[in-house]
């Protein structure tokens, strides 16, 4: 696979494919290293310095210290649509570049239904107020039966406790499936 193809996959998985993700620009792409393991069909990325991302629609410069990144496939491919598992871990620092009413609206739009909003709902048990609904098959289920929250110092650890396939909906729109 070419570096251009690898960079496209990285951008899709790291920044996302929404209008907000597509508007972002990685300012130090040359510092990112890629690898594709042909035996396990696993794409990995690493960077020896924080990845610097400009997000003009949300008014941030983001420094992301990438600790782990991979995308797994069932066969030799590099297309996001064929990914069966992906993960990225790291720490992040946000620096505001500007703020106005449009940026505040954009930030609110992005936050509602986001992974951060989802995990906050798990931690503070505010599923119904946030309009998150968890389904097993076609039946809504109690999220407390599927997640265990453990507080460690100032951090929270969230564990999926069921091995059943469950679906997540927010505001009546199916967002994702996940498994333990």
Name each model-derived stretch.
Residues 1-180:
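Surface-exposed, low-complexity/disordered segments
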């Amino acid at each position: 696979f070419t570096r251009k193809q690898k960079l496209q996959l990285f951008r899709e998985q790291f920044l996302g494919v929404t209008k907000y993700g597509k508007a972002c620009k990685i300012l130090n792409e040359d510092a990112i290293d890629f690898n594709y393991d042909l035996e396990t069909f696993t794409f990995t990325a690493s960077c020896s310095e924080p990845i610097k991302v400009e997000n003009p629609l949300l008014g941030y410069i983001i420094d992301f210290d990438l600790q782990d990144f991979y995308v797994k496939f069932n066969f030799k491919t590099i297309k996001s649509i064929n990914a069966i598992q992906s993960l990225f871990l790291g720490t992040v620092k946000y620096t505001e570049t500007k703020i106005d009413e449009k940026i505040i609206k954009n930030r609110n739009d992005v936050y509602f239904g986001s992974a951060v909003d989802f995990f906050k709902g798990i931690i503070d048990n505010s599923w119904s107020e946030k309009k998150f609904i968890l389904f097993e098959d076609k039946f809504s289920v109690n999220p407390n039966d599927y997640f265990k929250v453990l507080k460690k110092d100032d951090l929270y650890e969230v564990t999926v406790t069921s091995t059943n396939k469950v679906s997540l909906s927010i505001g009546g729109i199916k967002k994702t499936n996940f498994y333990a």
